[in-house]
Amino acid sequence: MRTTKVYKLVIHKKGFGGSDDELVVNPKVFPHIKLGDIVEIAHPNDEYSPLLLQVKSLKEDLQKETISVDQTVTQVFRLRPYQDVYVNVVDPKDVTLDLVELTFKDQYIGRGDMWRLKKSLVSTCAYITQKVEFAGIRAQAGELWVKNEKVMCGYISEETRVVFRSTSAMVYIFIQMSCEMWDFDIYGDLYFEKAVNGFLADLFTKWKEKNCSHEVTVVLFSRTFYDAKSIDEFPEINRASIQEDHKGRFYEDFYKVVVQNERREEWTSLLVTIKKLFIQYPVLVRLEQAGGFPQGDNSTSAQGNYLEAINLSFNVFDKHYINRNFDRTGQMSVVITPGVGVFEVDRLLMILTKQRMIDNGIGVDLVCMGEQPLHAVPLFKLHNRSVPRDSRLGDDYNIPHWINHSFYTSKSQLFCNSFTPRIKLAGKKSASEKTKNGRDTSLGTPKESENTLPIQVDYDAYDAQVFRLPGPSRAQRLATCRSVREQENHSRKSASSCDVSSSPSLPSRALPTEEVRSQASDDSSLGKSTNILMIPNPHLHQYEVSSSLGYTSTRDVLENMIEPPQRDSSAPGRFHVGSAESMLHVRPGGYTPQRALINPFAPSRMPMKLTSNRRRWMHTFPVGPSGEAIQIHHQTRQNMAELQGSRQRDPTHSSAELLELAYHEAAGRHSTSRQPGDSMSLNFSGTEELSVSLLSNSSTGVNPRTQNKDSLEDSVSTSPDPMPGFCCTVGVDWKSLTTPACLPLTTDYFPDRQGLQNDYTEGCYDLLPEADMDRRDEEGVQMTAQQVFEEFICQRLMQGYQIIVQPKTQKPNTTVPPPLSSSPLYSRGLVSRNRPEEEGQYWLSMGRTFHKVTLKDKMITVTRYLPKYPYESAQIHYTYSLCPSHSDSEFVSCWVDFCHERLEEYKWNYLDQYICSAGSEDFSLIESLKFWRTRFLLLPACVTATKRITEGEVHCDIYGDKPRADEDEWQLLDGFIRFVEGLNRIRRRHRSDRMIRKGTAMKGLQMTGPISAHSLEAAGPPVGKKGTSALSALLEMEASQKSLGEQQTTVHGKSSTQPAENSSVAMTPTYVDSPRKDGAFFMEFVRSPRTASSAFYPQASVDQTAPLVLDSTSLGVSTGQPMDRGNNQTFGNSQNIEQAFPSANSGDYSSQQHVASSLTSSSTLVEILEAMKHPSTGVQLLSEQKGLSPCCFISAEVVHWLMNNVEGVQTQAMGIDIMQKMLEEQLITHASGEAWRTFIYGFYFYKIVMDKEPERVAMQQPSAPWYTAGADDFASFQRKWFEVAFVAEELVHSEIPAFLLPWLPSRPASYASRHSSFSRSFGGRSQAAALLAATVPEQRTVTLDVDVNNRTDRLEWCSCYYHGNFSLNAAFEIKLHWMAVTATVLFEMVQGWHRKATSCGFLLVPVLEGPFALPSYLYGDPLRAQLFIPLNLSCLLKEGSEHLFDSFEPETYWDRMHLFQEAIAHRFGFVQDKYSVSAFNFPAENKPQYIHVTGTVFLQLPYSKRKFSGQQRRRRNSTSSTNQNMFCEERVGYNWAYNTMLTKTWRSSATGDEKFADRLLKDFTDFCINRDNRLVTFWTNCLEKMHASAP
């Protein structure tokens, strides 16, 4: 009951009363209101719509007679504070929304996450602009729809459809540069101007208004036909990209990439670039001035490479799970053509395109600049290269329902649109007249013969129609078909509504009425396809195949509408002009020559079959009054007020009838009456798209009310008269072009039982998720059966499946409720919403595969239905010429394969087992699961040098100026230890009382370096305030033993920004020979900051530094970093070393010295161990962590402790020796309890063996192989903890660049595994090295629990692969692979790592996997080609010499060249990127790869490592190499690629700005071609060094 009592409205701000509720109610004032009620608030006599809010909390202290509403909400609804309002409780059923649009930006939301977000919104209220948050996902409510009206607020029920629209999608814009671009349209605009100044300019403006941040790629494409008789007329080098078409003409397809994967605030500047390209274009694509080529002609748009272009983008979209970005969702291809949407295409390619597009849920928008024709578009004219032409067949056409098309009207056109009709319109006829003879004879209706001139229908409108989608859960498809005549008996005002039998030709359809101007689907939905209606066909019982042919042939599950005897299941059929009567016969796998006819001028008579493909995008759009999808960009110029009546339908109608009725109704025609004997075999192709819309709202289950039986018929008879179609125009679907919709989570197509039995094979398997709980390790989190069940649904959604929503009336299975609970809408109120339901069942579909997932008694049953006759999916090889974005005019020949993976082959059983195992080692991720993956690299931050370049430094080769000083290295190493601690989520104990008493404390576990500063990240926060690590304290202490003054010099010299000041550090070089130098694994660590390529063992004393000015192998990073001077004020004064030790307040400086002096290298191991255990002066032990035994320490810290506390231990190698002996004596052991024989220096956990575990020690005799004991424990330990070895590199005691050394440094034994000279780690040099290489794998794996902060209620885990070794001169790789993670939660974790890295002096950035992969590879991108930068060697060669390194051994030439190139890369700030060659990578090409310290750019040396003959060597070196092929092995230089993963989210001062990479490219290229003689200067400096050091 509604009350008229008024209350005062007060407003509150968010967070009022400790809650974020939008509505606060006093239960004393409103005794009848309870939690969960929906309350309607409105000012008396107010024209604005009332506000609906849900009561989530009651507050008794609110003043009398008031109700309090959140301020932001009152502003949206224009409610006035302190005014009177009515407050009424409303029934949720009356205010339930049909469709909610959520828009979001800069996030990746997987489909599984969307579904879980949708479920969290059920039983709540929504209002426009409302912010929605779930598990870190943020979205905002856009449009809300009830039936065909937009509303301001409403209630979300289980049946409400939620559509997600993304304002940061991946958008490919293809501009077809066919010959029409140079023509004028009828208004005098050049089509090119119309496209660029008109459409693109408008699009970019709309993006800006909507605040979009799409990642955009713009490509100009065209096809050039050559006047040639044979391939021999073309230059040999270009023949690869010349193709021959079905008519024997030679052609070449061109793609010029204008921008690639870019995000910009302002896109209009791009228009200028496109205009410049327009002027050069004829020359680029060999239409003019093409020497050596036959005469070329640009193709028309109809003969162009339209399908090929969109397939290139699909090759990228297919791989959306690779290089997964966390700040965009959605994929869209937009093709701008100067034509009218008619294309001549290859049949196989068309079918393949359709399969790929529909299955992958990609939106394709076709924007035509031409005049809208009077026939259906888009229209494909098919040519069959594969099947010999059959002389009986005419032309073959197809109207693709899956392409969303728009016609763009330029501003000048609008002025000319003042008059419309070209012929007189028919007057209205009475209903009785119309149905005489069972045929509508009004104007324009075709007669029986199909030769009558086609009626001119507006095809766009039809498109609209086609995409008229029905409401939410229309599964009435399951209904048994009742023929329409049964309805007629209910009550008919006029002649019967649809009879076909009386005349072969169904009335053609007129203007799709209101849909035309109706509201629209924007999005990349598959399209508003055009009017494809019915074709006259005498065989009434023949069920014909859909217009879009392709692979929805009648083999797709058929509707129940036709009784089985009449069903003719056929292979994909085709419509040919002239074969109207032909039946389709089944020949699985082959095509039949007889095909149905399609007449593009009267598509309304074309048969249309309902299939799951056609329904894939239906739930994206609101539904019109008669159930059709509403798409705003189809507008009609006629007033359709008559259609606005409210029509509801009888929920019992079968979908077929509804379709049919709606079809006619929408067409504004009445059909003839049906004879009683007729079976309902109506050719009813209601074009599903057309009208499936038609299914009524009521049947959707949203509002099951009593239906008015007459309403349907009435509306039919009063609908407007046929109206020639040209009065309707298709505009531009701006909504889909600005905020593309993601593929809907639900669909309503369900196959009938008969179809499932006849056409499908059924397979099922059961899983008992909770059965194996006992054998899992105790700590492993366990998923309940309900959680596993939901995860199964999520996984299917993630792979593109859709949940089939069925109407409430009929259940597919009598015992189990249909998806989303069959209970009456509101019986599960607010409270029960999250109650896990013991039983559940979901049906899901994708293409022609269906899954039924059932949970009963903790057992999950998965039933899969696969088609008995799968389609053969073609693989099409395509060759084209590509000009990448960084190149002005050079086209490269590329090839790719277009293919579509068969859905039937996905290993669901394996995936389901993987989910059940929740990350345990029984199942690991395999490539065929298409798991999501992102690769990250940890790079040493070089803020100073980067900043200098950003601020305008002319040259970029300022990174390798000075070698890193020791403290910097130590600092970095220490930072790395803190970073890995962060990965391991280890917190050091007693942080609060371990503050160092000096300027600022170091943060975290400082492992190295006089605590000079946060040396490498000036931009980062001041180095920590939280205490420090044992190592740093020890290093400090060591520093303090030297004179304070000297220390100050060093540190301050280092920290100054002027590199010149570093000279204060340079003292005379001292080379110390190490006892283990002979070839033991850890080579000597000379006390020289940078003589080794990556030796980063902290040196014992700073005063022996020998800076090496340039060492080619040390791809180090710039020193000269500004440091925070506050950090280094007083090194010498008594810093409390204690904080490094567990008991933080005992011990002082003198006792420390005492310990140090009492231990010598001759002390017994037990003595040293006792000193290590000392609570205040010993090694800092890790506090007890879950899963770590007590008394653990980190191996690198103990080695540094030994160096500082034991006399005579001066190098890491000696410290490692002592620890190695302890390990052998079993005084210490690896923390997993594993009896390793090797002590590994790095971030490895070891524990002190306590007396209380002698049995354990006895078990692990040294004689036992190191890998046997406790293998399971060990494996699970390794899956939980990150452990990284620190690589010791070979030292070169010399200032001479490596490439000029008389003998080259030894290289890793297996080149492929190491990829570069940088890591000279374990070469095959000694037994110790071999053992270590066995113990320390290249790559290790950890299973991470992602959701540390419990943001979600599911188990979230991912596999993390990381490098087993860390070297300061190489990037450290971390790869994440996942299936069961909420992307936002994972992103939150990685962002935490990113911040941690910054505070540790590093930079963590997402990078491309396989940046140099060829277009045809798994990681390749068909529109990306690497840029080659040649190295000008000719300027360095001496007169008469053939090779740069002629004075050395010939077999070292290549290695020297390689080292020389590395030295140049090092100067520019590149470090090595040892990408892991794992099972997931493309064929392991062992080409050395580098990444810039800013993470913005990759370099690759374009040749693999191998020995060459002298002749080859000479050729290689000549810059004018014979073969200039892109990927050839012949040129000396570098391949260059941008890291497109580095978006704004990840940028900081350490990555430089967006222009940084281009500046670097320009300067690097200048250096390599020897501009301003820079290359020669560099070379001569190197030679001088060599001569200077010669005796």
From Swiss-Prot:
<feature type="modified residue" description="Phosphoserine">
    <location>
        <position position="992"/>
    </location>
</feature>
<feature type="modified residue" description="Phosphoserine">
    <location>
        <position position="1518"/>
    </location>
</feature>
<dbReference type="InterPro" id="IPR036388">
    <property type="entry name" value="WH-like_DNA-bd_sf"/>
</dbReference>
<dbReference type="InterPro" id="IPR036390">
    <property type="entry name" value="WH_DNA-bd_sf"/>
</dbReference>
<feature type="region of interest" description="Disordered">
    <location>
        <begin position="478"/>
        <end position="532"/>
    </location>
</feature>
<dbReference type="GO" id="GO:0005829">
    <property type="term" value="C:cytosol"/>
</dbReference>
<feature type="region of interest" description="Disordered">
    <location>
        <begin position="427"/>
        <end position="455"/>
    </location>
</feature>
<keyword id="KW-0458">Lysosome</keyword>
<feature type="domain" description="DEP">
    <location>
        <begin position="1175"/>
        <end position="1250"/>
    </location>
</feature>
<feature type="region of interest" description="Disordered">
    <location>
        <begin position="1040"/>
        <end position="1064"/>
    </location>
</feature>
<feature type="region of interest" description="Disordered">
    <location>
        <begin position="1118"/>
        <end position="1153"/>
    </location>
</feature>
<keyword id="KW-0963">Cytoplasm</keyword>
<dbReference type="GO" id="GO:0048471">
    <property type="term" value="C:perinuclear region of cytoplasm"/>
</dbReference>
<dbReference type="InterPro" id="IPR045838">
    <property type="entry name" value="DEPDC5_CTD"/>
</dbReference>
<dbReference type="InterPro" id="IPR048255">
    <property type="entry name" value="IML1_N"/>
</dbReference>
<comment type="similarity">
    <text>Belongs to the IML1 family.</text>
</comment>
<dbReference type="GO" id="GO:0044877">
    <property type="term" value="F:protein-containing complex binding"/>
</dbReference>
<dbReference type="InterPro" id="IPR000591">
    <property type="entry name" value="DEP_dom"/>
</dbReference>
<comment type="subunit">
    <text>Within the GATOR complex, component of the GATOR1 subcomplex, made of DEPDC5, NPRL2 and NPRL3. GATOR1 mediates the strong interaction of the GATOR complex with small GTPases Rag (RagA/RRAGA, RagB/RRAGB, RagC/RRAGC and/or RagD/RRAGD) heterodimers. GATOR1 interacts with GPR155/LYCHOS; interaction takes place in presence of cholesterol and prevents interaction between GATOR1 and KICSTOR. Interacts with SAMTOR; interaction is direct and takes place in presence of methionine, leading to inhibit the activity of the GATOR1 complex.</text>
</comment>
<keyword id="KW-0343">GTPase activation</keyword>
<dbReference type="GO" id="GO:0031463">
    <property type="term" value="C:Cul3-RING ubiquitin ligase complex"/>
</dbReference>
<dbReference type="InterPro" id="IPR027244">
    <property type="entry name" value="IML1"/>
</dbReference>
<keyword id="KW-0832">Ubl conjugation</keyword>
<feature type="compositionally biased region" description="Low complexity">
    <location>
        <begin position="494"/>
        <end position="508"/>
    </location>
</feature>
<dbReference type="Pfam" id="PF00610">
    <property type="entry name" value="DEP"/>
</dbReference>
<feature type="compositionally biased region" description="Polar residues">
    <location>
        <begin position="1118"/>
        <end position="1149"/>
    </location>
</feature>
<dbReference type="GO" id="GO:0035556">
    <property type="term" value="P:intracellular signal transduction"/>
</dbReference>
<comment type="function">
    <text>As a component of the GATOR1 complex functions as an inhibitor of the amino acid-sensing branch of the mTORC1 pathway. In response to amino acid depletion, the GATOR1 complex has GTPase activating protein (GAP) activity and strongly increases GTP hydrolysis by RagA/RRAGA (or RagB/RRAGB) within heterodimeric Rag complexes, thereby turning them into their inactive GDP-bound form, releasing mTORC1 from lysosomal surface and inhibiting mTORC1 signaling.</text>
</comment>
<dbReference type="Pfam" id="PF12257">
    <property type="entry name" value="IML1"/>
</dbReference>
<dbReference type="GO" id="GO:1904262">
    <property type="term" value="P:negative regulation of TORC1 signaling"/>
</dbReference>
<protein>
    <recommendedName>
        <fullName>GATOR1 complex protein DEPDC5</fullName>
    </recommendedName>
</protein>
<dbReference type="GO" id="GO:0005765">
    <property type="term" value="C:lysosomal membrane"/>
</dbReference>
<dbReference type="GO" id="GO:0031267">
    <property type="term" value="F:small GTPase binding"/>
</dbReference>
<dbReference type="Pfam" id="PF23013">
    <property type="entry name" value="IML1_N"/>
</dbReference>
<feature type="modified residue" description="Phosphoserine">
    <location>
        <position position="505"/>
    </location>
</feature>
<dbReference type="GO" id="GO:0005096">
    <property type="term" value="F:GTPase activator activity"/>
</dbReference>
<dbReference type="GO" id="GO:0034198">
    <property type="term" value="P:cellular response to amino acid starvation"/>
</dbReference>
<keyword id="KW-0597">Phosphoprotein</keyword>
<dbReference type="GO" id="GO:1990130">
    <property type="term" value="C:GATOR1 complex"/>
</dbReference>
<dbReference type="InterPro" id="IPR055213">
    <property type="entry name" value="IML1_double_psi_beta_barrel"/>
</dbReference>
<feature type="region of interest" description="Disordered">
    <location>
        <begin position="695"/>
        <end position="720"/>
    </location>
</feature>
<feature type="compositionally biased region" description="Basic and acidic residues">
    <location>
        <begin position="430"/>
        <end position="439"/>
    </location>
</feature>
